[in-house]
Amino acid sequence: MTEKEILEKLRIAIADPKLNLDSTTENTENWDSLGQLSIITTLSRLSAGKTDLIDGVEDIKSISALIELLKVNNIIK
């Protein structure tokens, strides 16, 4: 799974075609509590549950931090 693939799926998950590496909970309208759940669920599905085991994934507040966390945990390249 690549960074680009993750971004494409997350754009669909929270219905925001402008979602990018600079997106945060503060500047992304659809990234509310339901959006957070959609992101977590999408990541779990895409990673076959591997993201469920990562501490802190549910607390992520920015796409750049999320991507970094996924890289550190060898979920994406």
Which role fits each region the language model picked out?
Residues 1-77:
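Phosphopantetheine-dependent thiolation modules in NRPS/PKS and related acyl-activating systems
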